[in-house]
Amino acid sequence: MNANPYARPRRGRGLVGEFLVVMLGVLVALALEQGLSDWQEARRADDTLLAMHEEMRDFAVVLRLRQATSPCVVQRLQELDDHLSGADSLPAIEAIGRTPYLFSSRSGWRGGAPELLSRHRGPRQAQVYGEIYQGMEEFALLAQQEQANWARLQTLQEAEGAVDAPRRWRLREEIAGARNANLLLTAIADQMLQRLASMDVDVDSAPLPVDMRERAVCQPMSRVEG
């Protein structure tokens, strides 16, 4: 006869208790692991934002340089337009110059940055940064295309002599292309600098790498004396 009829149920409750303790330990370990993973990912999001703000500060220098260059471009293109309105035989130009073309890194938005920022800073903030980097890409592409206009205009430096009607027309097309590019790039620069400043990006402290007053495009245009 069993003197302790409750022994088996107590043993069963003990096993259940041990199981619950083990499960609780597993859940706590998983929660800690997930918490650590989330913390590490949040740190990566912070580091990504810091890197992106550094790239945007560098890009602000490019935008400010465009603002400084724009008046010189307007003046030079008008001088070239007037030059092509002259006689059939045109003197060569000593130095036409061109707009500066600077590079800035845009790698911060590549890879997993969009998804990372969306998770830890919200979809709206990720969208804002995406729009900024898209604007940076478009600005760089347009600036590169503008260089082709100026390269063809610099052929007026090569030699004096007759410039036939077809060539004059082509050069006037290049002037129009360079003028439109400058208008667009300057407008983009103005808008993006305002937007970057609204995002607490330091857009003013870094000095410009080029003194435009010393560049040929900002100097009075002179003709080669024969």
Q: What are these model-derived regions, one by one?
A:
Residues M1-R13, Q34-G226:
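Long, hydrophobic alpha-helical segments that serve as membrane-spanning/inserting helices
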Residues P9-L27:
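N-terminal signal-anchor/signal peptide hydrophobic helix marking the start
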